[in-house]
Swiss-Prot record:
Positions of phaclofen binding: S247, S270, H287, E466
Compositional bias segments (type: Polar residues): 868-880
UniProt keyword annotation of Coiled coil present: yes
Gene of this entry: GABBR1
Protein name: Gamma-aminobutyric acid type B receptor subunit 1
Regions that span the bilayer: 592-612, 632-652, 668-688, 711-731, 769-789, 805-825, 834-854
Organism phylogeny: Eukaryota, Metazoa, Chordata, Craniata, Vertebrata
GO BP, sorted A to Z: adenylate cyclase-inhibiting G protein-coupled receptor signaling pathway; gamma-aminobutyric acid signaling pathway; negative regulation of cell population proliferation; negative regulation of dopamine secretion; negative regulation of epinephrine secretion; negative regulation of gamma-aminobutyric acid secretion; negative regulation of synaptic transmission; neuron-glial cell signaling
Cross-referenced Gene3D superfamilies: 3.40.50.2300, Complement Module, domain 1 (2.10.70.10)
Protein's UniProt keywords contain Phosphoprotein: yes
Chief site of localization: membrane
SMART domains the UniProt entry points to: CCP (SM00032)
Phenotype upon changing Y230A: Slightly decreases signaling via G-proteins
Organism: Homo sapiens
Family: Belongs to the G-protein coupled receptor 3 family. GABA-B receptor subfamily.
Sequence ranges of Pro residues compositional bias: 929-944
């Protein structure tokens, strides 16, 4: 993009600007050249779309010619834009021409003469072959290049071989696993024997020597291999090289071989640990390292967009080191191994763990016998199908899952169902091109020849896929020994002089092996610095019970060749994990609307009651009910009812940024509504209890109720709430929190899980604040119930509606005491919690308004008591007699006056009694006592008429009523 910006002024300049130029040039750049036929041009730094959008390229810009298929550029491969607007070497055209194989231009132990063309060999070129002395040509001596093909097979030079009876034997010690974890020896041993026959029949390779094989069955067991290694080393004849098969056996053999100066060449070992040259200094293998699978696996993960994988491995060094390498590679690619399981012999528990962890993309690393155990457990756990993809090793037998295995209890049909659709990555072990190898056989001819040699079907033969590697291993050894020995007649060492103390011959064999490069039946054979084979990777998929090739990957060039023949059970590659969709549980809108309508009607009712109370505040009956407190009750009910609206608001209506404000609105509206509504009723009942009860014991408390005390009490309750809420909001404000529930699996989509979430208003110390709030509110409710019960029999006109207040307190307290804990328990059920809380608010508000205000409305309407106090005093006597309030007031006044007179009379009586007692004592001192008269006491005088103010009990009792 930066390059395009820099070149934009050049590209946008009109073609005719800048003076006279040649038709294909401009002073500011060069015109784009058309690519040659069967070829193209590589524009460095530009994409294909960018190239289509421009016509000129800047000065000093270079283009490169490339050709398709088996063609090469003839002429300049690179051209550069000159300052004069022309390209370099325009007098020489660049063409893409078909070439013949370059392998015909060299001949081992001979010379090639090219006529009729230059290198590379073009159509019409001719080559003549000549062998060196002591060699003779096998095949045609001339070949002609025509349409990219040579007219005859490539010949080779054979040495004039020593007679067979005079050739010296060179022994190879081999360990073939005929059974065990990988029974690769079943096919690899016949392949090795084929290679020995072919090598020994050649006159140009080891003409003075004959390779012979001494072998044992290692059973892919290091313990068994140790026994046979001892026999190979300590029994004659001397072996010049060792050839193990399994990685576990190769690890043992290769680590010990250096002590006997032996080269180790393996045909079936893939353990990455064997690439350690310090630990295994003399080790080579024609089987590529298992780490060669990992770049292919990572490439496929990226192709299908997988970012999370799981692994299960058999606990052996080869698989552990392979998995360690895979972990490093996926980490570099931004892919995560979420779950890693291993097992020694029983994979049941690891497979269950994979199922429990919802693993989807699973890489399995284990031998063939363990693979059957794993997939039997996979079938039992249903860990297969369109949700899962398994990546396995590709060197199992093609029908490995159909082979009878007494260690598992799954049928062939069950195993076939479990393995369907899995992917294998396999080293290309058979040359896909039908070209002739150094043995003068094509790969197809090799397969046919080996199949005839085997005693059973190739699919039932272990190691059949690795057989080409074993065949090429013998050829690599033969060529290295041939180079070490001098190739017959030339200077070299005597192989028969080798012994376990002769490091010189070992070093020469090592150098010869390290420089190996030839075409084998498995492809081009070459070893890297660690002694491992370099090769392509074949990607296959099990489709309908048989493996189908779906691609190749060349890790050295990062080139993925895809055939687009992959098939998926679900129609497409599955997701690497269950897609978790977070969904919020919102309040039922029908419930919210219904309760909102009830709340709105309640607010209207509160406004009507408030208006009624204010309008009739001059009426004595309304005045005696403390109308201002009733007004506060109506306002409190309105605020509480208004709290229903923010209580039902959630993410369905508002954004997350507005949620804290809604939380505060809920808290303040409900808190202040309760304080005003319930606080004013509590104040009434408190003062009724304080002033108008226990009058016999505390008559001095019978005072006139002062209104300011009522308002002060309400103010104290509201102030406590305001202070508490303010501190709460400042110190630990409410905010939006998310409650997450268990995942839900929808039936219609297998790769999606629903993660329900619920929004809450909460704070860090939510439980502490609720404890404080509910604590003193609960005490007020309980105290209100107690006071309402204590004052139920009190009759007073100062607060004439205290019984209605008590009834309202009962209802509010019961609803609140039940609803508060229930809503806390049901907080995770948004509909139930909202229904309980909102309906409790609505019902308590409705009950309070109806109980307090409806009787007053009914009384004023039915009795017509709409007069004020001034109007009431101007009424006639009949009206006065009908006014119970006035009579009550007059009787109370008279009662107080009579009580004062009675107290004075009682004091006078007490004083007279004291005087009488004093006189009696004085008389008794002057005259002796005389017997009392039968009547006793003082002489009775005429009875006095009862005084109007005498302390008659019935009268006093009447006054106290």
């Amino acid at each position: 993009m930066l390059l395009l910006l820099l070149l934009a002024p050049l590209f946008l300049r009109p073609p005719g600007a800048g003076g006279a130029q040649t038709p294909n040039a401009t002073s500011e750049g060069c015109q784009i050249i058309h690519p040659p036929w069967e070829g193209g041009i590589r524009y460095r730094g530009l994409t294909r779309d960018q190239v289509k959008a421009i016509n000129f390229l800047p000065v000093d810009y270079e283009i490169e010619y490339v050709c398709r298929g088996e063609r090469e550029v003839v002429g300049p491969k690179v051209r550069k834009c000159l300052a004069n607007g022309s390209w370099t070497d325009m007098d020489t055209p660049s063409r893409c021409v078909r070439i013949c194989s370059k392998s015909y231009l060299t001949l081992e132990n001979g010379k090639v003469f090219l006529t009729g063309g230059d290198l590379p060999a073009l159509d019409g070129a001719r080559v003549d072959f000549r062998c060196d002395p002591d060699f003779h040509l096998v095949g045609s001596s001339r070949s002609i290049c025509s349409q990219g093909q040579w007219s005859t097979p490539k010949p080779h030079c054979q040495v004039n071989r020593t007679p067979h009876s005079e050739r010296r034997a060179v022994y190879i010690g081999a360990l073939f696993p005929m059974s065990g974890g990988w029974p690769g020896g079943q096919a690899c041993q016949p392949a090795v024997e084929m290679a020995l026959e072919d090598v020994n029949s050649r006159r140009d390779i080891l003409p003075d020597y004959e390779l012979k094989l001494i072998h044992h069955d290692s059973k892919c067991d290091p313990g068994q291999a140790t026994k046979y290694l001892y026999e190979l080393l300590y029994n004659d004849p001397i072996k010049i090289i060792l050839m193990p098969g399994c990685s576990s056996v190769s690890t043992l053999v290769a680590e010990a071989a250096r002590m006997w100066n032996l080269i180790v060449l393996s045909y079936g070992s893939s353990s990455p640990a064997l690439s350690n040259r310090q630990r295994f200094p003399t080790f080579f293998r024609t089987h590529p390292s298992a780490t060669l699978h990992n770049p292919t696996r990572v490439k496929l993960f990226e192709k299908w967009g997988w970012k999370k994988i799981a692994t299960i491995q058999q606990t052996t060094e080869v698989f552990t080191s392979t998995l360690d390498d895979l972990e490093e590679r996926v980490k570099e690619a931004g892919i995560e191994i979420t779950f890693r399981q291993s097992f020694f012999s029983d994979p049941a528990v690891p497979v269950k763990n994979l199922k429990r962890q919802d693993a989807r993309i699973i890489v399995g690393l284990f031998y063939e016998t363990e693979a059957r155990k794993v997939f039997c457990e996979v079938y039992k756990e249903r860990l297969f199908g369109k949700k899962y993809v398994w990546f396995l090793i590709g060197w199992y037998a093609d029908n490995w899952f159909k082979i009878y295995d007494p260690s598992i209890n799954c049928t062939v049909d069950e195993m076939t169902e479990a393995v369907e659709g899995h992917i294998t990555t396999e080293i290309v072990m058979l040359n896909p091109a039908n070209t002739r190898s150094i043995s003068n056989m094509t790969s197809q001819e090799f397969v046919e020849k080996l199949t005839k040699r085997l005693k059973r079907h190739p699919e039932e033969t272990g190691g059949f896929q690795e057989a080409p590697l074993a065949y090429d291993a013998i050829w690599a050894l033969a060529l290295a020994l041939n180079k070490t020995s001098g190739g017959g007649g030339r200077s070299g060492v005597r192989l028969e002089d080798f012994n376990y103390n002769n490091q010189t011959i070992t070093d020469q064999i090592y150098r010869a092996m390290n420089s190996s490069s030839f075409e084998g039946v498995s492809g081009h054979v070459v070893f890297d610095a660690s002694g491992s084979r370099m090769a392509w990777t074949l990607i296959e998929q099990l489709q309908g019970g048989s493996y189908k090739k779906i691609g190749y990957y060349d890790s050295t060039k990062d080139d993925l060749s895809w055939s687009k023949t992959d098939k998926w059970i679900g129609g497409s590659p599955p997701a690497d994990q269950t897609l978790v969709i977070k969904t919020f549980r919102f309040l039922s809108q029908k419930l919210f609307i219904s309760v909102s309508v009830l709340s709105s009607l309640g607010i209207v009712l509160a406004v009507v009651c408030l208006s009624f109370n204010i309008y009739n505040s001059h009426v004595r009956y309304i005045q005696n009910s403390q109308p201002n407190l009733n007004n506060l009750t109506a306002v409190g009910c309105s605020l509480a009812l208004a709290a229903v609206f923010p209580l039902g608001l959630d993410g369905y209506h508002i954004g997350r940024n507005q949620f804290p404000f809604v939380c505060q609105a809920r808290l303040w509206l409900l808190g202040l509504g309760f304080s005003l509504g319930y606080g004013s009723m509590f104040t009434k009942i408190w003062w009724v209890h304080t002033v108008f009860t226990k009058k016999e014991e505390k008559k001095e408390w019978r005072k006139t109720l002062e209104p300011w005390k009522l308002y002060a009490t309400v103010g104290l309750l509201v102030g406590m709430d305001v202070l508490t809420l303010a501190i709460w909001q400042i110190v630990d404000p409410l905010h939006r929190t998310i409650e997450t529930f268990a995942k839900e699996e929808p039936k219609e989509d297998i790769d999606v899980s629903i993660l329900p979430q619920l929004e809450h208003c909460s704070s860090r110390k939510m439980n502490t604040w609720l404890g404080i709030f509910y604590g003193y509110k609960g005490l007020l409710l309980l105290l209100g119930i107690f006071l309402a019960y204590e004052t139920k029999s009190v009759s007073t006109e100062k607060i004439n509606d205290h019984r209605a207040v008590g009834m309202a307190i009962y209802n509010v307290a019961v609803l609140c005491l039940i609803t508060a804990p229930v809503t806390m328990i049901l907080s995770s059920q948004q509909d139930a919690a909202f229904a309980f809380a909102s309906l409790a608010i609505v019902f308590s508000s409705y009950i309070t308004l109806v109980v307090l205000f409806v009787p007053k409305m009914r009384r004023l309407i039915t009795r017509g008591e709409w007069q004020s106090e001034a109007q009431d005093t101007m009424k006639t006597g009949s009206s006065t007699n009908n006014n119970e309030e006035e009579k009550s007031r007059l009787l109370e006044k008279e009662n107080r006056e009579l009580e004062k007179i009675i107290a004075e009379k009682e004091e006078r009586v007490s004083e007279l009694r004291h005087q009488l007692q004093s006189r009696q004592q004085l008389r008794s001192r002057r005259h002796p006592p005389t017997p009392p008269e039968p009547s006793g006491g003082l002489p009775r005088g005429p009875p006095e008429p009862p005084d109007r103010l005498s302390c008659d009990g019935s009268r006093v009792h009447l006054l106290y009523k």
